[in-house]
A protein has these predicted regions:
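Membrane-lumen/periplasm interface segments of specific transmembrane helices
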Residues: 24, 218-219, 231, 243-312
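Multi-pass, polyprenyl lipid-linked donor-dependent membrane glycosyltransferases
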Residues: 36, 122-127, 149-188, 211-221, ...
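Interfacial juxtamembrane loops and adjacent helix segments
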Residues: 50-105, 110-113
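Transmembrane-helix motifs of polytopic, lipid-linked glycan transferases
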Residues: 119-144, 179-184, 315
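Hydrophobic, aromatic-rich transmembrane alpha-helices
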Residues: 127-137, 227-235, 299-336, 358-364
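Transmembrane-helix signature of polytopic, membrane-embedded enzymes
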Residues: 135-159, 176, 194-197, 323-327
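Membrane-interface alpha helices of multi-pass inner-membrane proteins
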Residues: 155-156, 197-215, 226, 253-254, ...
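Perimembrane helix-loop-helix junctions
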Residues: 183, 187-191, 220-253, 281-282, ...
Length: 381
């Protein structure tokens, strides 16, 4: 197919077809699938809808309407009468409160929709956003091979919004954030130093901070950018490099404010996690059994392999911008894998965020480099 525009339209339509199939499948979902985490996320949303911003306080004393107890009773949980036995709730030593262990982000987003009809709109909007990013990559691509890669990855990214992202309500917003951060990372670090601007970097830091409000482990997603900014400052010792790093860090903290406020209210300190005392919190310890579990998960293993391949391709590229992004992405992968491979529990979606972030970053780096090259050639001509 010689006409790039025709090829772009073909793959955009393929992504649209996948989007339609996914939305149709999601439309039949139930909000009562008997998963403990689902109930806790929906309880946080219920608190925000009842109390507004006071919904940050998730103490079980606020369940005076019996919302969460009735949910656990409906699924046959034997300890539904005992607050201390409720899943994904922990007792905080500093306040004595029995609170939800998860960050408030999923509940805040779910609270935007009417009770009883919250999950499907969350997944619909997130999947539509991923489709939009896929189209952005497709139409930014210039070479036929890049258009094909962007289109195929777009179809895959939309497919992933059900399998395995359906496993947790924290994952749909995380998937969208990974796509946005992949784009912003290239805008911030894929250009020469003289062309770097503060605004995209501040936005990137803020969005990375927001990701922590959905999953605490998402804090590691910003490790590559943080490491790059630190090394850049240590090498140059320029005030400009310091200011860039400081702006990124401040924006990161600003994005995390909902989680910090939640911690402060529920634990008595913004630096004390509500996961304290949770049975799912285990010490870091490298074991081959965890590695084997991830390798046996074909989807996670395949996505990580693609992420590594894309990162290596960027690192070996001749263009300086691509190489910088490749180095940054490599650092990000190493730090994230170091954490998850030493965490004693392997779950079907734990490595999905770092894989998506790496793949979106690699994709946008490639297609945006083609755009810049085309512009430079046009100016030369």
């Amino acid at each position: 197919m010689k006409n790039p525009l025709t090829l772009k339209i073909v793959f955009a339509v393929l992504c649209l077809l996948m989007l339609g199939l996914q939305l149709r499948s999601m439309s039949g979902w139930s909000e009562s699938r008997g998963v403990f985490d689902d109930i806790c996320y929906l309880r946080q949303a219920h608190l925000f809808q009842r109390f507004g911003l006071a919904g940050f306080d998730t103490d079980m004393s606020r369940d005076d309407d019996g919302y969460v107890r009735s949910k656990f009773r409906e699924i046959g949980f034997p300890g539904w009468k005992d607050d201390k036995e409720l899943p994904c709730h922990n007792t905080m030593a500093g306040t004595g409160k029995i609170v939800i262990q998860y960050p408030p982000g999923p509940g805040m987003v779910l609270a935007l929709f009417p009770e009883g009809h919250q999950v499907v709109p969350l997944f619909w909007l997130s999947t539509i956003a991923v489709f939009a990013f896929a189209c952005l990559a497709i139409f930014r691509a210039r070479k036929p091979a890049s258009i094909v890669v962007a289109g195929l990855f777009g179809v895959l990214a939309i497919y992933l919004m059900i399998n395995p992202i359906k496993a947790s309500y924290s994952m749909p917003p995380t998937a969208v954030i990974c796509a946005l951060c992949g784009y912003l990372t290239v805008r911030c670090f894929g250009v020469p130093e003289a062309d770097r601007r503060f605004a995209p970097l501040v936005i990137l830091g803020f969005v990375f901070g927001l990701s922590v409000d959905f999953r605490l482990a998402n804090i590691f997603l910003c490790s590559g950018c943080s490491l790059f900014l630190l090394v850049d400052f240590l090498k140059s010792r320029h005030a400009q490099s310091f200011l860039r790093g400081a702006a990124f860090a401040l924006a990161l903290v600003a994005g995390m404010l909902p989680t910090l406020v939640s911690y402060w209210i529920n634990t008595g300190s913004p630096l004390t996690s509500t996961y304290h005392g949770a049975p799912t919190v285990v010490p870091l310890d490298f074991t081959l059994s965890v590695v084997w579990e991830y390798l046996n998960d074909i989807l996670q293993a395949a996505l990580l392999a693609l992420s590594i391949a894309g990162t290596v391709a960027l690192w070996l590229a001749r263009q300086g911008g691509l190489r910088r992004v490749g180095q940054l992405t490599a650092g990000n992968l190493v730090i994230n894998l170091a954490f998850f491979l030493t965490y004693g529990i392997a779950v079907s979606y734990y490595t999905i965020p770092i894989s998506l972030l790496s793949l979106w970053t690699s994709l946008f780096a490639s297609v945006m480099q083609e755009t810049e090259t085309a512009r430079a050639e046009a100016v030369t001509d």
